Amino acid sequence: MSIRSPFVVVMGHVDVGKTLLLDKIRGTSVAYREPGMITQHIGVSFVPWQAVERFAGPLVDKLRLRGKIWIPGFLFIDTPGHAAFSNLRRRGGSVADLAILVVDITSGLEEQGVESLKLIQSRGVPFIIAANKLDRIYGWKSVENRPFLFAVEQQEWHAIATLEEAIGKLIDQLSRFGIEADRYDRVRDFSKQVPIVPTSAVTGEGIADLLLVLAGVSQRFIPREKLSVSYGPAKGVVMEVKEERGLGVVADVILYDGVLKKGDVIITAGIDGPKETKVRMLIMPKPLDEMRDPEDRYMAVEEVKAAAGVRIVADGLDGVVAGAPIFAVWDLQDIQKVVQLVREEISEIKIETDREGVIARADTFGTLESMVLFLRQQGVPIRRADVGPPTHKDVVEAVLSRRKNPTYGVILAFNVKIPPEVEREAMSSGIKIIRGEILYRIFDEYIKWSQEVKTKTIEQILSQMTKPGKIQILPGYVFRRSNPAIVGIKVLAGTIKPGVTLVKDGKEVGRIMQIQKSGKPINEAVVGDEVAISIHGDIIVGRQIREGDVLYVYVPDEQIRQWLFQYRQYLRDDELKALEEYLKLRKR
């Protein structure tokens, strides 16, 4: 077995310099390579350790790392961001071995940075933080490609003070997520603290430090067996499926183990389940030294060994979804076994149950897995989760789910378009569709919407329930003795409304027909109000009820239980007092 280079993903908020940082790292690799040393990949940039040593020589010596690094180098995923990270999935973990979370040192951790951080944590991937835009620290004196440890020694005190303040703010932000972090040269225990490396993607300062810290973290925290590559059928993950002129539909794949050969049978997965096909062509970029014509950048190869990024040309790749596993089969007797393996793997991501919960949709297996994981962590139950745009069935399932809980009548759509006919059907069925490209925004919108639904639902329930109330007939304010009786009253506790039934000593005396205040009808009267009420019932004031009598609002038994055990918080103190007194009277 040989040792492969670890896969590294760069993540972070928009405009923090992820792409520029990647470009700087790639440029470093090209500039300091030995002739013929750089192997080109599809979707991946290889940075050999020898190039890092050449670039960061003085810092390598200062940190005493020369001769101690056994990894061949790094394989940087060319596309930064959480979508690429999500698609680098494998059963039980991630194909990504390391992550760099890029943060703008001048503004700290931002929204998508938080999303990236939680995604990294959910997959258990070791990571370091690049505190980028070091060149924007007020008063900072930049020198191109200088290591940070050497640069900081040459700065004025006010620039260092500004830097320390920015790093301190970032450390505080990270602590809110349970992460202990510090500037990398101050970290005492890398198993407990996350290193922060100040960098500038513009000047190249700190890039050397970043690569050396990455090497140290990789050797310390990535199990050697995870980086061991066997000579056997290839194992990989689909990163992108697209149509290429002259080739048809192709799949860009990351191989993390084994060997893939032209003519191999491969098993992967689409929306409808496992797919079997045969490799017609394997395409790799030409070596840099041979790349003369920009239009002639690629070449066909007979085989590719992991770890690598390769483009596969094969029949039947349309419908294959990014994030799907891909396995080569050398012994044809193993095909059904591998098909079952793929089926089991995607069934762990896709969800179809009769339980209560929301409907989840995402564009790839990777993003769906991240979405499901995140929703479960937030305590949101899922009834159905699948890859691709929402369908008629999703709307039907959402309607069924809503019957059990109104907040589950929703489709959460991550990175997918909504077909117009599905949108119309959802609207007519009263099903909410929340679509977005940032998972946390979808979740936040769902929480906001579900709270509105809960509030509206509770308001509807409460509007149909009878609130407790206690009144006293005011002496000298009998305006009519019967048919209906009209009297002046004071609300001693609770609330009264037209339509409620009044009781005296546990016996019903009549129903309030109307409430008037200052000669005008009102919808309700609350504690402290003095109003006139008309009472419909077989009563005469002076017989069944008298001046000075205390009457209570009749509350049905089921509603009493609801008020006490479900909606107690919606009762005012005086309403609760009226209910408790009413219960005591009933027990006499």
Swiss-Prot record:
Residues 3-224 form the tr-type G domain. Coiled coil: none annotated. The gene is infB. GTP binds at residues 12-19, 78-82, 132-135. Belongs to the TRAFAC class translation factor GTPase superfamily. Classic translation factor GTPase family. IF-2 subfamily. Keywords: GTP-binding, Initiation factor, Nucleotide-binding, Protein biosynthesis. PROSITE patterns: G_TR_2 (PS51722). Signal peptide: none annotated. Residues 132-135 are annotated as: G4. Pfam families: GTP_EFTU, GTP_EFTU_D4, IF-2. Function in general translation initiation by promoting the binding of the formylmethionine-tRNA to ribosomes. Seems to function along with eIF-2. NCBIfam families: aIF-2, PRK04004.1, small_GTP. InterPro entries: EFTU-type (IPR029459), P-loop_NTPase (IPR027417), Small_GTP-bd (IPR005225), T_Tr_GTP-bd_dom (IPR000795), TF_aIF-2_arc (IPR004544), TIF_IF2 (IPR015760), TIF_IF2_dom3 (IPR023115), TIF_IF2_dom3_sf (IPR036925). This is Probable translation initiation factor IF-2.
